[in-house]
Amino acid sequence: MRTDQTKPRRILTAVFALLLAAATLAPLGSQGVDQARLQPLREYIKMSWSTLTRSNRDLLQALPDPKMPRKPGEPWLLYISPQESRTRVQDELTRELGADAMKRIEIRVLPRDVLSIREHGLLYLPRPYVVPGGRFNEMYGWDSYFIQVGLLRDGEIARARDMVENFLYEIVHYGTILNANRTYYLSRSQPPFLTRMILELYERTGDKAWLQGTVPAIDRYYRFWTTAPHDVPDVGLSRYFDRGTGPAPEVVADEKDERGRTHYDRAREYYRTHDVTDYDEALYYDSRRDRLTDLFYKGDRSMRESGFDPSSRFGALNVDVIHYAPVCLNTLLYVMEDDAARIMDTLGDSSAARAWRQRAASRRDLINTMMWDEQAGLYYDYNVRTRQLRRYDFATTYFPLWAGIASPAQAARVRDNLKRFEAPGGLLTSTEVTGNQWDAPFGWAPLQMIAVNGLRRYGFTDDANRLAAKFVALVSKEFDEHGTIVEKYDVRRRESDVAADIKFGYSANQIGFGWTNGAVLDLIAGMK
C-alpha cells in the first residue's frame, strides 16, 4: 500500500509527465503530425499485420491458447460446425499442412449443446484473420473493427475482406459473431460493428454483388441483439447477456494474480471487505456461505460480452451489467440500423431501407430520451430495473457523437465536459480509479478513436486534434522506449507499465497490438 511518504514523489512524477507531454506534443500539434518522426512506428504497424495474421496454412500457430492449459503430447483440438464438411476441412488442412502435422490435430464436430463442452479448442474459420496479440491468439469481435480500420488505412484490402468474410461465416455456422473463435466463447458475442466493417470495405471495393450477399447475415445478427435474452421488451433497448452459466473457463484457468488467486477469488474477497451500495449485493454474493451466486457468474460473463472487463461502470465488479441498457451497445445498434438502411438504398430496396431507417429513428429517440442527462451534459447507461441513469462518468458518452445521434446542443455539452476525461496522454476511460483496467487512469485506443471522431463530426476540430495528438505522442514515446505497441496505457502518467495498478482481471499489458495499431493510424490520418 502506498503511504503518505510517496506523495511528494508522485507529485513530482505528475509534474514531470505534464512537462514531458508538452515537449512531446510540440511536433504533434493540432496543425498536423511529423510524419518522419512517426515513420518507424508506422513501419512497425505495417509489419505487424503479417505477424499477427493467423491462417489455416499456419494453423499450428493459431491453435495454441495462452489462456488454457494443455498437457504435453495432447492433440490440438479444432472444432467445426455440424453444417461444415469434415472431409472438406480435413482435406484442405492436409494440403496446407501435410500429413505429419495433421497427426497433431484432432478435428471435432461441435455437439448440439455447445455449452456442455469441457475440452476446449479453436473454432475453424475459412479465411486468414488478424489477432490482437499476446494472450489473445484468436479473432475477436470488436477488436476486429479497429484492426480493419488500420488494414484499410494501410491498403490491406484483401486482409480486411477476409476479416469480414470470417464474421459472415461465424454468423451462419456459430449463430453470431463470437467474442472470439474459441469454444468457451460460443455463449457470447461482443459490441457489434459488423455493418461498419461491411460499409467501410464496400467503400473501397464497390463490389455490389458482394454487398448483396451480406444482407442475410446482417438480418440474423441484428435479431441476435434485438430478441431475448438481449432485448428489454418494455424498454425498447438492448443489453449484454451471456447465454452460459457458471465460471468462465478461461478466467478460472488464466486470470490469476501473483498469489495464484483467480478473478473469482478476488471478487469474493472484495465482497467480504467492502460495503456494496451500487446494487443488491445478495443477488451476486451469498455472505453466509462466502459464495458467488449463479447470477454473479451470469453477470460476469455478460460483462465480458460488453468488452469492458472489468470496470465499475455497472457497479462493483461490473456484474450488474445484465440490468442495464448500455449507451455503447444501443448506439452501435443504431449504427447497424442506419448502416443497413444505407446498404438497402445502395441495393435499390427502398422499402427495406425505409424500415431500417424507422428503427434507427426510434432508437435514436430512445437514447436521447432515456440516456441523456441534461443536468450533467453527458450520456449515461440506463438501469432497466430502477428506471434510472447510473451517473458514472465513462468515455462511452462519446459514442452518440461518433454515431451522429446527439443534437448540436448535446454535443456541445459533452464537449464542455471533456476536461473531466482529458489527461496528459489522452482520454481517460472513466473518472474513477477503481483498480479495474477499464477505469482511470487507463486509456484505450478504441475509445480515443471514437471520441476524437465524435468531436470532429460536430466541428470540435481543435479538441479532436489535441486529444489525438496526446494519445499518438504517448504511443510513440512508449514505442521509442520499448519497441512495441501495447493494449492499454496509463494516460495520466503517460506510460505502458500498468500492472501494479490493476487489481482485477489480468494485469499484464499485451503486446501487438491490433486495435491500438488500427486506431493510431486513424488518429494520425485525422490530424493531417
Task: Outline where the language-model segments fall.
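Extended glycan-interaction surfaces of carbohydrate-active proteins
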Residues: 40-138, 162-181, 235-325, 365-443, ...
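Bacterial N-terminal signal peptides that target proteins for export
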Residues: 3-15
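Bacterial N-terminal signal peptides
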Residues: 14-23
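Long, repeat-rich segments with strong aromatic
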Residues: 320-347, 441-449, 454-458, 462
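Aromatic/His-enriched, Gly/Pro-containing loop or helix-boundary segments
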Residues: 171-214
